UniProtKB/Swiss-Prot annotation:
Similarity comment: family membership: Belongs to the AceK family.
Entry annotation: catalytic residues: D384
Keywords: ATP-binding, Cytoplasm, Glyoxylate bypass, Hydrolase, Kinase, Nucleotide-binding, Protein phosphatase, Serine/threonine-protein kinase, Transferase, Tricarboxylic acid cycle
Record-level GO BP terms: glucose metabolic process; glyoxylate cycle; tricarboxylic acid cycle
InterPro entries: AceK_kinase (IPR046855), AceK_regulatory (IPR046854), Isocitrate_DH_AceK (IPR010452)
Protein name (database record): Isocitrate dehydrogenase kinase/phosphatase
Known catalytic reactions: L-seryl-[isocitrate dehydrogenase] + ATP = O-phospho-L-seryl-[isocitrate dehydrogenase] + ADP + H(+)
Domain of life the protein comes from: Bacteria
Compartment annotation: Cytoplasm
Ligand binding (ATP): A328, P329, G330, I331, R332, G333, L334, K349
Function field: Bifunctional enzyme which can phosphorylate or dephosphorylate isocitrate dehydrogenase (IDH) on a specific serine residue. This is a regulatory mechanism which enables bacteria to bypass the Krebs cycle via the glyoxylate shunt in response to the source of carbon. When bacteria are grown on glucose, IDH is fully active and unphosphorylated, but when grown on acetate or ethanol, the activity of IDH declines drastically concomitant with its phosphorylation.
Keyword Kinase annotated: yes
Species per Swiss-Prot/TrEMBL record: Cupriavidus necator (strain ATCC 17699 / DSM 428 / KCTC 22496 / NCIMB 10442 / H16 / Stanier 337)
Length: 613
C-alpha cells in the first residue's frame, strides 16, 4: 500500500469501519435465517413458501449495501471523506475481521459499499480489497462445538454402515417422519456396496457429512464424503417427500460427475446454513476439485462472493494471456452484442442500443428478463449469469472488428479512458457473463447422426422441463440453446421469456376458404402472449435428420394439449419435482421392491447422470 498510515488516529475511520461491518453482520444474519426457514418449510411441504424465500434472499445483499451506504452518507458524509481516512477505514476493518467467521464475505461487502459511494476512478488498491487480507484457513466454530462444519462417522466395517448412515440421518433432526427409514438405509448400504464392489476397507475408513442440509426445489441433500485409505469419494443423499407425504431417501450419489451436476451453474442456488462458509467451500472443493471456488460460493447462494472471485480469476487470466477479445462465433443476435476471449471459457453479452424488427423490446425489459431468470428455479436448464457494471478492459486486447461492432451497435455502452498504467482502456458500462457453450444449431448441423439424436432428445427435454417450471422460452430457435462440454442442452437467450401461465396456448384455426389455406402469411389474429405449438414445426423440423429424431422422441411437442396440461397443473398450484440425476438412479426405479413400495410417479427426467453442465 502506498503512503501506509503510521498511526490509526481517526475515530471517524473506526466508526465507519464498525458501521460497515455491522451492515454485513445484519446481512449474514438474515441470510442464515432463510436457511432456518427453508428447513421448516421443507418439513411442512410448503413448496411455494420455499420458492418465495429463495427469491427474497437474492435481494438481501443489495438491500444491505444500500442501507449501509445511506447510513454512511447521512452520518459521516462518506463521499467527501479524505483519502487518508479511507486508508485507515480499511485497516480498522481488517482489524475487526481478525476473529470473524466470514471474513472473505465481509471484505466483499466492504468493496460493494465503497464502490457504491465512490466514483470508479477511486477504486484503487488502497481503498478496497483487491486480494484477501484475512486468511480463511482453519477457522473453527469454537462458539458452538455441537455444530462443527462436518461430522465424522466410523463404520468400522461394511457391516457397520447401516448404523452409521442411520446416525447421519438422525443428526439432522428432521421433524417430519420417515416412511420407512430402515428400508431406505438398506438401499443406501446396498448402493454403496454395489458401487465399491470388492474395495478393501482401510483402517481409516470413515464417513464425513457437512452439518447442515442443502435445500433446493423440493429436496434436502446430505452432502459428504467417504474416506478409505488415500482415496476420497463424494457422497450425496437427497431426501424427498414420498407419495405418502412422509420422507424418503431418494438415492445416493457417489460419483464426482453426479456432484458436478448437482452443483451446476444451470441450477438455482442452495439454501444452507453455514457459520463458516469458507470451510464448506474447502470441503466441497475436496470432492469436486475441478470446480472453481467462485462457482461453489455462487451455488451456495453467496453469489456476490462468487462474482468477486470470478473477477479476480478473470484479471489473473488477462495478466497471463495475450489473445484478443473477438466477436463470438455464430449467428449474430438482434438484442445482444456477444464477444469472447478464445482462451477463456466464457462469453460477454452487452445489450445493444437499438433492436431491428421484428424485436420489440427495451433495455430495461431485457434486464428484467435476466433478473427473472436469476430469481426463478432454473431446473438445470438455464445458464446462470454474472452481471457487472463499468468493467475496464485493455483496449489493446480488443480486436478491431469487435470495437467496430460496439461503435455501430452499442456506442452508449462504452467509453474510453486512460488506465493507471497510462494505457488506453475501453470501459463497458453493463455486461452479462455466461459460461461458453456450443450453439445447438452448430451442434446439430455438424454432428454425427448419434449426436443429432442426442441433441434433439436433450432439446425436447430441456423445453419440457422449462415449461414444467413455468418458463416459456419465447424464441425457441436452436441458436438460442447451447450444448455444454458434456452434452447437456441449456437455454441461454432470455430476452423473450415469459411465464407459461401468462401465455395463451392456441390451436391454429382451420382456414375458412381456399385463399386462407394457400396463404403464405399468417391470416388469423395473433395477440400478445399467444402460443401456437403446431407452428413450431416450421422452424424446428427443416433438417431431415433433426425431423426424424424429433418425431421419434418428441412428437407431442407440437400438440397444444401437452403445453396446456403443464399450464393447467401450474395454475392449480402444482410444483413439479426436478431431479439433478437420472431417474434410473432413484431407489423407486433402481430396486424393484422400492418401486412397489413407494409407487413410480412420473417426473421430468434431466437426462443421463454422466452429463455435466
Amino acid at each position: 500500500m502506498s503512503h501506509f498510515p503510521k498511526l490509526l488516529s481517526s475515530q471517524i475511520a473506526f466508526d465507519v469501519a464498525r458501521t460497515m461491518l455491522d451492515g454485513f453482520d445484519k446481512h449474514y444474519r438474515l441470510f442464515r435465517e432463510v436457511s432456518h426457514q427453508a428447513k421448516l418449510k421443507f418439513e411442512a411441504g410448503d413448496w411455494h413458501g420455499l420458492q418465495q424465500i429463495q427469491r427474497d434472499r437474492i435481494a438481501f445483499y443489495n438491500e444491505r449495501v444500500r442501507e449501509s451506504s445511506v447510513i454512511l452518507e447521512d452520518e459521516y458524509d462518506a463521499e467527501n471523506i479524505e483519502d487518508e481516512i479511507w486508508q485507515q477505514i480499511k485497516l480498522h476493518y481488517i482489524g475487526l475481521l481478525t476473529n470473524h467467521h466470514q471474513p472473505e464475505l465481509a471484505e466483499t461487502f466492504f468493496n460493494s459499499v465503497c464502490t457504491r459511494i465512490l466514483h470508479r476512478s477511486y477504486f484503487n488498491n488502497d481503498f478496497i480489497f483487491v486480494r484477501p487480507a484475512i486468511s480463511t484457513e482453519y477457522i473453527e466454530n469454537e462458539e458452538s462445538p455441537t455444530r462443527p462444519t462436518f461430522r465424522a462417522y466410523y463404520p468400522g466395517s461394511r457391516e457397520g454402515m447401516a448404523a452409521c448412515f442411520e446416525r447421519v440421518v438422525h443428526n439432522f433432526q428432521l421433524e417430519s417422519p420417515f416412511e420407512d427409514l430402515q428400508r431406505d438405509i438398506g438401499y443406501v448400504v446396498r448402493a454403496v456396496s454395489e458401487h465399491f464392489g470388492d474395495l478393501r476397507i482401510a483402517p481409516n475408513f470413515q464417513v464425513h457429512t457437512l452439518s447442515s442440509l442443502f435445500f433446493r426445489n423440493k429436496s434436502a441433500f446430505i452432502i459428504g464424503r467417504i474416506l478409505n485409505g488415500d482415496r476420497t469419494f463424494p457422497l450425496a443423499i437427497p431426501i424427498v417427500h414420498g407419495p405418502s407425504g412422509k420422507l424418503t431417501l431418494d438415492t445416493v450419489l457417489l460419483k464426482k460427475e453426479q456432484l458436478l451436476i448437482l452443483f451446476s451453474f444451470t441450477h438455482s442456488y442452495f439454501m444452507v446454513d453455514m457459520e463458516i462458509p469458507s470451510a464448506y467451500v474447502t470441503f466441497l472443493r475436496d470432492i469436486m476439485p475441478r470446480k472453481p471456488r467462485a462457482e461453489i460460493y455462487t451455488s451456495l447462494g453467496l453469489q456476490k462472493q462468487g462474482k468477486n472471485l470470478f473477477y479476480r480469476d478473470f484479471l489473473h487470466h488477462l495478466q497471463h494471456s495475450s489473445d484478443k477479445f473477438i466477436v463470438a462465433p455464430g449467428i449474430r443476435g438482434l438484442v445482444m452484442l456477444v464477444f469472447t476471449l478464445p482462451s477463456y471459457p466464457y462469453v460477454f453479452k452487452v445489450i445493444k442500443d437499438f433492436f431491428p424488427a421484428p424485436k420489440e423490446t427495451t433495455r430495461e425489459l431485457v434486464k428484467s428478463k435476466y433478473q427473472l431468470v436469476k430469481q426463478h428455479d432454473r431446473v438445470g436448464r438455464m445458464a446462470d449469469t454474472l452481471e457487472y457494471s463499468d468493467v475496464a478492459f485493455p483496449l489493446s486486447r480488443f480486436d478491431e472488428a469487435l470495437v467496430r461492432e460496439f461503435e455501430q451497435h452499442a456506442p452508449s455502452m462504452i467509453e474510453y479512458q486512460r488506465g493507471k498504467d497510462g494505457g488506453e482502456e475501453i470501459v463497458v458500462r453493463h455486461v452479462y457473463i455466461e459460461r461458453r457453450m456450443t450453439p445447438l444449431n452448430i451442434y446439430l448441423t455438424e454432428g454425427t447422426d448419434e449426436q443429432v439424436e442426442h441433441g434433439v432428445i436433450e432439446y425436447g427435454n430441456a423445453v419440457k422441463e422449462l415449461i414444467a417450471a413455468n418458463i416459456f422460452p419465447g424464441d425457441m430457435l436452436y441458436k438460442n440453446f447451447g450444448v455444454t462440454r458434456h452434452g447437456r442442452v441449456v437455454f441461454y437467450d432470455y430476452d423473450e421469456i415469459e411465464y407459461l401461465t401468462d401465455c395463451n396456448i392456441r390451436d391454429v384455426p382451420q382456414p375458412r376458404n381456399e385463399e386462407e389455406e394457400m396463404s403464405g402469411e399468417v391470416w388469423y389474429t395473433v395477440r400478445p402472449h399467444d402460443i401456437f405449438p403446431e407452428t413450431f414445426r416450421t422452424f424446428l423440423l427443416g433438417d431431415t435428420r433433426v425431423r426424424a429424431a424429433f418425431l421419434r422422441h418428441h412428437a407431442d411437442f407440437f400438440d397444444p394439449a401437452m403445453w396446456q396440461s403443464h399450464k393447467d397443473r401450474l395454475l392449480a398450484g402444482h410444483v413439479h419435482d426436478f431431479f439433478a440425476y437420472h431417474s434410473s438412479e432413484r431407489f423407486i426405479h433402481r430396486y424393484s421392491e422400492a418401486g412397489s413400495a413407494q409407487g413410480t410417479a412420473a417426473v421430468p427426467d434431466p437426462g443421463p447422470a454422466r452429463r455435466v453442465a
